[in-house]
Regions:
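Bacterial Sec-dependent N-terminal signal peptides
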Residues: 1-20
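Carbohydrate-active catalytic/glycan-binding domains of CAZyme proteins
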Residues: 19-554
Length: 554
């Protein structure tokens, strides 16, 4: 059991500090403490971000795809310091009978809005259509999602409440499902925004000038309807803004931000927000490959009713992204960051954690009394190939370009049969980990990896160690090298490497196996976390692993 004060292992040294409400990362802080910030303001995979201001508070959500809890919501007072405060989809996504992971499916490009005292989040499910959930309090409870408009390929939905009381929704199409992409459409919704009452009308075709236009965000200002959207592809694109006096067009457009001479490739979709004192800002993502899609904050200004995003040094109306800038002019706020480390001293899972699929309540027990998280071994399916297929993977986003993840665990398998496993995993379409398995020879620690896990490949083991104790410390060291990946794999992404090690006493760690090149997941960045499984054999119970703590350090 751990007290509120705890000792943090960093290599072989010990640092003691107290837990506080405002978590501050050891590995990435955007606020520089001198009135400036550095980008990314969120060095984590908050893909397709959208944000709003309500009073003096800012809220951000992002694509969660098939990960649960879904639609994590972050809160900030200054657009720089963010913490996770809730999730709009706490347990499962429709169809709720799904038990398998839905990699890259389900929740695409949400849009968060506040209207008439309620928070709304719209999103597209590429296989079902446009959904909406709402709540009076951003911390919930959130309503059961409503299918607003059914249709294959409807994605990137964004509502707009007009001054006359009518409600509209703009959206894009996923070519993989709809057979059409690079267009943006608008339909009208009923007054309570729960149902489309007209067919969608295509209002912009980007095939010639702005191919792969997607991710629209709908706004109205000074009598103009504005649609902000990216084009040109995720890693290589640019920001476009359209405007019209008529909601159905015709729209005129401008490119308002592009990479230019900056190092920020393909500044992609995001959100315009203003401060209470009238400053304008734009949050968007940058795809960096293995770590995912990172969130940047750009200054924004209006010139002749056109937005200019970033810094426009040549005055052509198209800005470039900044890497450092002065913070928004709001009241000074304490430095904080999204939660990472977890001492498991609560009766609820930390908001930084997500499972790989709809959540089964039998997977875990938050044992506050003992200060541990207990994961019960869940049986794999008969057609199990590798961990890509496992729903009870408990994972969190990479928090920085370079960091160390360490966990302390105690494995308690059922001795009468073999094959129960747990461990520390760096998860993506390729993955690697330290797996502890109950075998005929006792507990064995394996340095395991799986290339092309998403294609059903089998795991390989490059080193094993017999364990004399069921209590062990596992560690992953993640380093972004500065090198670029091969041109055949995209060329623009930075190489991220992982070294794995273990310890019997938490002081001396021994590296095991080879260096692993980290690979992203399906539309998401790589993640780090754990699991507990057993073979699919008939049994009325299984073993478990008690995780004492999980810590992110330098």
């Amino acid at each position: 059991m751990k007290a509120i004060l705890f000792s943090l292992l960093i290599g072989s040294s010990i640092t003691t500090f107290a837990q506080s409400t405002d978590y501050v990362s050891q590995v990435w802080v955007a606020d520089q403490g001198d009135g400036t910030y550095r980008n990314p303001v969120l060095y984590a995979d908050y893909s397709d971000p959208d944000a709003i201001r309500v009073g003096d508070d800012f809220y951000l959500t992002s694509s969660s795809f098939g990960c649960l809890p879904g639609l994590q919501i972050l809160h900030s007072k200054d657009l720089v310091n963010w913490q996770i405060v809730s999730a709009a989809i706490p347990y499962s996504l429709a169809p709720h009978t799904d038990t398998a992971p839905q990699h890259g499916n389900r929740v695409w490009a949400p849009c968060i809005r506040h209207h008439d005292g309620e928070f709304y989040i719209f999103w597209g499910d590429p296989d079902q259509g446009a959904f909406m959930t709402k709540a009076k309090d951003v911390k919930g409870p959130w309503s059961e999602p409503v299918l607003v408009k059914a249709g294959k390929g409807i994605i990137d939905t964004t509502p707009l409440w007009d001054e006359d009381g009518r409600v509209y929704m703009a959206h894009a199409y996923a070519g993989s499902r709809a057979g059409l992409k690079s267009v943006i459409a608008v339909c009208e919704l009923n007054a309570d925004a729960t149902r489309a009452i007209t067919q969608s009308r295509i209002i912009f075709d980007g095939h010639e000038a702005h191919e792969t236009c997607e991710g629209p965000k709908f706004y109205k200002r000074n009598g103009y309807y504005y649609i902000f959207h990216p084009a040109g592809g995720v890693p290589t694109g640019w920001q476009v803004v359209q405007r019209s006096k008529n909601i159905y067009g015709p729209y005129e457009w401008r490119t308002v931000m592009a990479q230019g001479k900056s190092s920020v490739n393909g500044p992609h979709q995001g959100a315009w927000v203003d401060t209470a004192n009238g400053e304008d800002w734009f949050l968007h993502f940058q795809d960096v490959g293995a770590a995912g899609r990172l969130v940047h904050l750009q200054p924004m200004k209006w010139v002749n009713d056109w937005p200019v995003i970033g810094v426009d040094e040549d005055g052509d109306g198209c800005g470039e992204p900044v890497l450092t800038y002065k913070k928004p002019a709001v009241a000074k706020q304490p430095i904080c960051t999204p939660q990472e480390s977890d001492e498991f001293n609560s009766n609820e899972l930390g908001l930084q954690w997500q499972w790989n699929a709809n959540i089964d309540e039998k997977w875990y027990f938050c044992n506050k009394e003992q200060g541990v998280l207990r994961l019960y071994s869940a049986p794999v399916t008969d057609d199990y190939k590798n961990l890509w297929d496992v729903p009870n993977m408990l994972l969190q986003k990479f928090p920085a370009p370079t960091f160390t993840a360490t966990m302390k665990l105690k494995f308690n398998p059922i001795g009468k049969y073999y094959g129960e496993r747990t461990g520390l995993v760096i998860m993506g379409m390729d993955y690697a980990g330290l797996m502890i398995e109950n075998t005929e020879k006792g507990l064995v620690l394996s340095r395991t990896e799986c290339k092309k896990a998403d294609k059903g490949s089998a795991e390989t083991v490059n080193k094993t160690v017999k364990l004399s104790s069921n209590e062990v410390y596992l560690r992953a060291r993640i380093v972004t090298t500065g090198k670029k990946i091969k041109e055949s794999e995209g060329g623009h992404d930075l190489v991220v490497e992982c070294k794995l090690s273990y310890s019997k006493d938490g002081k001396k760690f021994k590296e095991i196996g080879e260096t692993f090149q980290v690979k992203e997941g399906k539309w998401i960045g790589a993640k780090v976390g754990t699991f507990c499984t057993r073979p699919n054999i008939k049994s009325n119970d299984g073993g478990w692993v008690d995780i004492d703590w999980f810590r992110i350090t330098k």
